[in-house]
């Protein structure tokens, strides 16, 4: 039986697994988590323009919590103790490992094991959870959170205090997806499986969930759960037709990216200049 089939079958019986069965699951689970760390296994992939969730990844992660015990994390000067079932990704890394990975990690960045960080990425003091994927040349700015299984593409800028929601349960729910070349403004939140398509610009303080109306100012079209490619989106509100005097939060597509917008959100290659 393949590791995938073994884990799929074990997940269906997760409440009845014996101690011996859990011990036998450790090697395939550790193999799977290592594949997540290398970016070979992903919680979601684009297939013909549509993002498809791989539920196996969530089952793998959830089962790993059954096979591990909480332990005190290794401490270094200035780092508080932790008590968790997962180690931190960089806990055992040395200078050579960081050079090989071609990433920059500022003090205060916390990345749990099982997350993938691609070459050229820059991590300011942020939190990145298990199963997350961060693409090449992407910056995760200060106090931002990339939730479990969230997918962030290449050459994105995730500004300070942004929250990208994670999802492990329900199993079939899609994770948040941020495609390539996206700029997300400070203190924005993207959650509940929302997809932000390539090249979009999300303004400061925009909240996007599955039920958030995304209104195109030019056409009046209302959509949910997906920001179109190259859209420029800001926070807005609209009147509640059933209750005059009350307005409901929404997001507004004010235009599509032009050269003026792109110049304001252009990435600075100097901060990504890592020798390879």
Swiss-Prot record:
Co-factor(s): pyridoxal 5'-phosphate
Coiled-coil residue windows: none
Keyword line: Pyridoxal phosphate
Lineage: superkingdom: Bacteria
Similarity comment text for this entry: Belongs to the transferase hexapeptide repeat family.
The protein's name in its UniProt record: Protein TabB
Species, as recorded: Pseudomonas amygdali pv. tabaci (Pseudomonas syringae pv. tabaci)
Gene: tabB
């Amino acid at each position: 039986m393949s590791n995938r089939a073994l884990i799929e079958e074990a997940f269906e019986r997760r409440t009845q697994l014996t101690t011996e069965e859990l011990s036998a699951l450790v090697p395939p689970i550790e193999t799977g988590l290592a594949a997540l760390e290398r970016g070979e296994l992903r919680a979601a992939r684009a297939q013909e323009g549509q993002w498809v969730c791989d539920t196996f990844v969530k089952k793998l992660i959830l089962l790993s919590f059954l096979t591990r015990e909480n332990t005190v994390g290794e401490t270094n000067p200035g780092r508080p103790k932790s008590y968790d079932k997962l180690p931190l990704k960089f806990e055992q890394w040395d200078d050579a490992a960081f050079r090989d990975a071609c990433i920059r990690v500022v003090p205060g960045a916390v990345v749990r094991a099982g997350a993938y960080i691609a070459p050229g990425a820059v991590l300011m003091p942020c939190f990145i959870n298990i199963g997350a994927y961060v693409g090449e040349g992407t910056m995760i700015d200060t106090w931002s959170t990339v939730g479990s299984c969230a997918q962030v593409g290449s050459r994105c800028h995730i500004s300070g205090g942004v929250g990208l929601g994670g999802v492990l349960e329900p199993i079939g729910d899609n994770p948040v997806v941020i495609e390539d070349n996206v700029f997300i403004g400070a203190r924005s939140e993207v959650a509940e499986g929302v997809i932000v398509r390539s090249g979009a610009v999300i303004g400061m303080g925009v909240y996007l969930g599955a039920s958030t109306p995304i209104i195109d100012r030019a056409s009046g079209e209302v959509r949910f759960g997906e920001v179109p490619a190259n859209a420029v989106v800001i926070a807005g509100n609209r009147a509640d037709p059933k209750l005059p005097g009350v307005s409901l939060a929404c997001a507004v597509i004010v235009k599509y990216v032009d050269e003026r917008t792109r110049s304001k959100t252009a990435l600075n290659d100097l901060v990504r200049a890592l020798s390879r």
